Every structure is written in C-alpha cells, then in structure tokens.
C-alpha cells in the first residue's frame, strides 16, 4: 500500500472551512514569508485559492502585531491573490486591531480562545440532592446518501453525519460532511470530511482525481498527490495533523 505524508513547518497554517472561507492561523509573524507561502498556494491551485476569502488568526502568537505590520500583511496577501476579509476573535488587542484595519472580527472562533484563558478554579460543587434518572442519549443522525452525480458548482453538505455518494463528484463540485465521506464514483471536485473538526473522519473514493481533499480543515491539493495514486481507489485520513492518502488493496 503506497502512501504519502509530507512533513514541513510553514509560517502560516491554512485550513479550509465548510463554507469556503479559509482560516490562516499565523504561526510566525514573518510578512514576506507568509506572502510567499500564499503566492505558492495560489500558483499551485489557482481555481481553489485565487481570490479566496481568508480569515487571519493571530491567536497563535505571543504578541498581537502592530497596525503597520498587520497592514503590510493584508496588502501582501491581496497582492498574492487572496482576499483577507476578517480577523478571528481573540483578545481585546485583536478587537482593537480589527477596528483600526476596518475589517470585521468573527466571533465564531471565540470558543478556542476562551477555553484557553486562565481562570480561578471553580468552587466545589454542592452535595447531590438525589439521583436523577439519566437523560436519554441522542442517537447519531443517519448518514446522508446522494444517488445522482454532484455537478460543477453544486455543494452538498451532510450535517452531523457521514455522506455517501453513489455517483460522480464533478470538477468544481464540493461535497462536505461532519463525518466521513464515501464516494463510489469518480471524485474530480473537492471532498471535505470532519467539517466541524472531527480528526477521525475519513474519505474513501473508488476513482481519485480530487481537486482537493480536507479532513478537519487540513487539506491536500491534487498537485501534491503522487501520480501513482491518481485514478486509484484510495482512502484519506489525518495523522498528526498531516493528510495521508493510500491506495486501497
């Protein structure tokens, strides 16, 4: 079974969201390097990243960038071919920076910062009064099945479940699932599994020509896939934050 797993450390980690907006989490505040990396992404996959909406996430930095540096980064990313549209929610300094830059602050990222905040330990809970009957456990939603082809420009989303496609996913089409994705035809478009962050989701495909595959936001484009895996039946999974692709025996 052949596989691919390329390990590298980039200044910015780009994750693909379920609504087509990418989240660029800044690891190293090196503006020229970040711009070069984005130019490389756009060059390798212009249909995917050209004029893509990007959210900037400074939460991984020890210090919020100053206004001049942030402006230089926004200008550089625009020149690289993408469109910075917002900052990810963070500290009060990031809130102020978003106002100075004149771009929105997206509160959908609030939880990842608030859970990391240091807070005093909670007081001990009061002794339980009496045992209450256990609440019924919700059953997972049944998987979604798509019998017809998913054509160019169409997007299919399976919320809180797996997605099974019995036909082809055409070039320019997008299939998304919070769980795993099973494609019994040809995959020429994009497949995004674990869209709500599930790292255990997988993608299974009978005929692999995907423009992009992603699991929990981590992605790989077709140009990064070895030729010997194209046109094969494959599985795609996430291991140590790296996409791995292997032929099915």
UniProtKB/Swiss-Prot annotation:
UniProt feature, compositional bias: Pro residues: 119-130
Domain of life: Bacteria
Region (Disordered): 116-149
Presence of keyword Ribonucleoprotein: no
Keyword terms, alphabetized: Cell cycle, Cell division, Septation
One Pfam family of this chain: MinC_C
Record field: compositional bias (Low complexity): 131-142
GO BP, sorted A to Z: cell morphogenesis; division septum assembly; regulation of cell division; regulation of cell septum assembly
Disulfide linkage: none
Gene3D superfamilies: 2.160.20.70, 3.30.70.260
Record's keyword annotation contains Cell division: yes
HAMAP family per record: MinC
Purpose of the protein: Cell division inhibitor that blocks the formation of polar Z ring septums. Rapidly oscillates between the poles of the cell to destabilize FtsZ filaments that have formed before they mature into polar Z rings. Prevents FtsZ polymerization.
PANTHER family, per database record: SEPTUM SITE-DETERMINING PROTEIN MINC
Subunit architecture: Interacts with MinD and FtsZ.
Assigned protein family: Belongs to the MinC family.
Protein name (database record): Probable septum site-determining protein MinC
Organism: Xanthomonas campestris pv. campestris (strain B100)
Gene, per the UniProt record: minC
């Amino acid at each position: 079974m052949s596989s691919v797993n390329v390990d590298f450390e980039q200044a910015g980690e780009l994750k693909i969201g379920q609504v087509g907006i990418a989240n660029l989490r800044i690891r190293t505040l090196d503006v020229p390097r970040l711009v070069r990396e984005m130019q490389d992404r756009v060059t390798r996959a212009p249909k995917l990243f050209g004029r893509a909406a990007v959210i900037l996430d400074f939460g991984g930095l020890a210090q919020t960038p100053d206004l001049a540096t942030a402006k230089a980064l926004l200008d550089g990313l625009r020149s690289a071919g993408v469109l910075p549209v917002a900052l990810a929610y963070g500290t009060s300094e990031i809130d102020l920076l978003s106002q100075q830059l004149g771009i929105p602050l997206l509160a959908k990222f609030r939880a990842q910062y608030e859970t990391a905040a240091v807070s005093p330990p909670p007081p001990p809970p009061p002794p339980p009064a009496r045992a209450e009957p256990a609440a019924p456990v919700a059953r997972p939603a049944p998987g979604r099945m798509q019998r017809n082809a998913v054509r160019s420009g169409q997007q299919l989303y399976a919320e809180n479940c797996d997605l099974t496609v019995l036909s082809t996913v055409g070039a320019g089409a997008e299939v998304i699932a919070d769980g795993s994705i099973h494609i019994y035809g040809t995959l020429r478009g994009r497949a995004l599994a674990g869209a709500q962050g599930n790292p255990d989701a997988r993608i299974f495909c009978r005929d692999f020509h995907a423009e992009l595959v992603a699991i929990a936001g981590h992605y790989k484009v077709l140009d990064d896939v070895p030729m010997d895996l194209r046109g094969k039946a494959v599985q795609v999974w996430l291991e140590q934050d790296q996409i791995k692709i292997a032929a099915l025996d």
